């Protein structure tokens, strides 16, 4: 969500901080700001509502410069998007603070600080943290201790970066439930909410652990655990500038990432399957011991990853015969869950830092589960560190807020898992089809121009309805989510068999209805449902297997290359991604950074 960047350097750091924010734009934000301590130890701040480029323009006007500084992109939680609510927040013109997360007891702390004489100028919970740290600094004149004491009083999940004009040589950071990275450079050191921001600036990084705090100077980074004891944390080399993502020849990151799916699926499968087996070591060292004991499965995730889990339910129950329950993480956290014996708990997350998914995993670790498995795209994430078993997808960095390649690699991972847990020779057919998957993706991507031609038919629509049956119902859900995320068209998805139980009332000549219709055992049932749409004058678009002879009957048929039955949910997802993309482009929306959304949702 919010992006944090901070540095202490022997040079002017303002342009580095700005570039760090540009690399964090993909996370989603509505305002941005920077604060530095200048050569005369004065605290200078610039904040704007809007894009990082607006901040760059404002910085040029004010000629802001300094060797120590913090910067931030804000995604509004407490307080509307505005310059007044943008970070960094100040206290008494001495302390500047950036914050990612939520301080749950901010109202109580606010009232307490008001009694101490503090005045508030914003609606945010962040300003509470700034004043609280100032209060403790007045008592101890030690910035690190002031931050540690303040964090102990604050409830919630957050990460902070703090500077003080009387301590121009240091930057203090703390992590409590929200990710933060420390970076080592030459004559300069950094903090950031994402290692991507530090590429080409830092040579190596430390991923702060839960409860860690750090004091960062030009010469050193000292890390303290939750007990305020100095500790040594593992350092990890950081990839060079050559690996920083760019759009290449594509107009948007989302389109680039859609077209990368064949490659990243190839990477995800590589060295993990052969013609007769899935290498269980792909799921971690413990998998060979755990998998034979699995009798039930619970899958917990959010958003697109939840849809991946829903598809996986069909595969796991059909192939492995394992009862599988799929839960939305934010709901799972707050109910009493019955855990049958020998249940495998699976979490799915692109970032591995999704707050609700992590909280669900922590809850599961206190329950009677056999073990936990994380399917994740980020090897250094909290989810990966906390799970018993891990399958790392190899989707690479995904910049577009609307997930594409991360989703299809999650599906590839789940299909491999179903094959690994399958106890009969159907697993070999699944593996054969998986080996064909990258080529199938390439064929589907050749539909791009045909799908683009549909966009003009959706531009002026207000609503859309997606339909699927069986395992294609979650595919329809994902298609509807993509369309609403980036085109802002209200879209719903239903099992086609539920049409007559309510959704049919919405169907008329102005309602586009999109159906997913592979050649499977439910095809005839689906055709019957679609006749109901046609009879009501609905504007029908059907993605059909190109081996089938369909009678259009007024519907627009979009032929999808034939593929193996187990691959159909993956293959039929791709044209729906393309449809959402081209409709959004035709409408002129911000495809890569849609309004109100964040890439990594690190708060509840």
Swiss-Prot record:
Domain Glutamine amidotransferase type-2, chain residue ranges per copy: 2-219
Catalyses which reaction(s): D-fructose 6-phosphate + L-glutamine = D-glucosamine 6-phosphate + L-glutamate
Active site: 2 (nucleophile), 599 (for fru-6p isomerization activity)
SIS domain boundaries: 279-427, 454-594
Annotated PANTHER family: GLUCOSAMINE--FRUCTOSE-6-PHOSPHATE AMINOTRANSFERASE, ISOMERIZING, GLUTAMINE--FRUCTOSE-6-PHOSPHATE TRANSAMINASE (ISOMERIZING)
Protein purpose: Catalyzes the first step in hexosamine metabolism, converting fructose-6P into glucosamine-6P using glutamine as a nitrogen source.
Protein name, as recorded: Glutamine--fructose-6-phosphate aminotransferase [isomerizing]
Organism: Legionella pneumophila (strain Lens)
């Amino acid at each position: 969500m919010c992006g944090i960047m901070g540095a202490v350097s022997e040079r002017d750091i303002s342009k580095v901080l700005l570039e760090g924010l540009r690399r964090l734009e993909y996370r989603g934000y509505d305002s941005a700001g920077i604060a530095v301590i200048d050569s005369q130890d004065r605290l200078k701040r610039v904040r704007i509502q809007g894009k990082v480029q607006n901040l760059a323009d404002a910085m040029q006007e004010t000629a802001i410069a300094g060797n120590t500084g913090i910067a931030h992109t804000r995604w509004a939680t407490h307080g509307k998007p505005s310059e007044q609510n943008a970070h960094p927040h100040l206290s008494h013109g001495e302390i500047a603070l950036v914050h990612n997360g939520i301080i749950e007891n901010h109202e109580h702390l606010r009232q307490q600080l008001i009694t101490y004489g503090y005045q508030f100028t914003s609606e945010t919970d962040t300003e509470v943290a700034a004043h609280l740290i100032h209060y403790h600094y007045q008592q101890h004149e030690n910035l690190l201790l002031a931050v540690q004491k303040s964090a102990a009083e604050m409830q919630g999940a957050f990460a902070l970066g703090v500077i003080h004009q009387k301590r121009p040589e240091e930057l203090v950071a703390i992590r409590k439930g929200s990710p933060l990275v420390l970076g080592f450079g030459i004559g300069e050191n950094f903090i950031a909410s994402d290692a991507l921001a530090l590429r080409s600036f830092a040579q190596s990084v430390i991923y702060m652990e839960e409860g860690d705090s750090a004091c960062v100077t030009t010469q050193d980074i000292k890390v303290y655990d939750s007990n305020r004891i100095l500790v040594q944390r593992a350092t990890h080399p950081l990839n060079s500038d050559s690996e920083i993502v760019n759009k290449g020849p594509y107009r948007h990151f989302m389109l680039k990432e859609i077209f990368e799916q064949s490659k990243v699926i190839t990477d995800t499968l590589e060295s993990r399957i052969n013609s007769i087996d899935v290498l269980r070591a792909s799921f971690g060292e413990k998998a060979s011991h755990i998998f034979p004991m699995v009798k039930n499965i619970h899958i917990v995730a959010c958003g697109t990853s939840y849809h991946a889990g829903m598809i996986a339910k069909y595969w796991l129950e059909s192939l492995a015969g394992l009862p599988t329950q799929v839960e939305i993480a934010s709901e799972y956290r707050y109910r009493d869950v019955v855990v049958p014996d020998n249940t495998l708990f699976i979490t799915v997350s692109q970032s591995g830092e999704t707050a609700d998914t992590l909280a669900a995993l922590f809850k599961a670790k206190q329950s009677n589960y056999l073990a936990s498995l994380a399917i994740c795209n980020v090897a250094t994430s909290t989810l990966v560190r906390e799970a018993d078993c891990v399958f790392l997808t190899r989707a690479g960095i995904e910049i577009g807020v609307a997930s594409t390649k991360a989703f299809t690699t999650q599906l590839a991972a789940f299909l491999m898992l179903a094959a690994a847990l399958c106890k009969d020779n159907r697993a070999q057919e699944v593996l054969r089809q998986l080996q064909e998957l990258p080529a199938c993706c390439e064929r589907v991507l050749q539909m791009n121009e045909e799908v683009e031609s549909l966009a003009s038919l959706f531009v002026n629509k207000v609503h859309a309805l997606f339909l699927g049956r069986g395992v294609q119902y979650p595919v329809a859900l994902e298609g509807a989510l993509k369309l609403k995320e980036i085109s802002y068209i209200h879209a719903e998805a239903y099992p086609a068999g539920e049409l007559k139980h309510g959704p049919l009332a919405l169907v008329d000549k102005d309602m586009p209805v999109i159906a997913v219709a592979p050649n499977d055992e439910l095809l005839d049932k689906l055709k019957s449902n679609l006749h109901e749409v046609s009879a009501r004058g609905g504007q029908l678009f059907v993605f059909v297997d190109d081996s089938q002879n369909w009678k259009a009957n007024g519907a627009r048929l979009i032929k999808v290359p034939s593929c193996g039955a187990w691959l159909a949910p993956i293959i039929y997802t791709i044209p729906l991604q393309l449809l959402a993309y081209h409709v959004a482009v035709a409408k002129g929306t911000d495809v890569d950074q849609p309004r109100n959304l964040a890439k990594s949702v690190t708060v509840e």
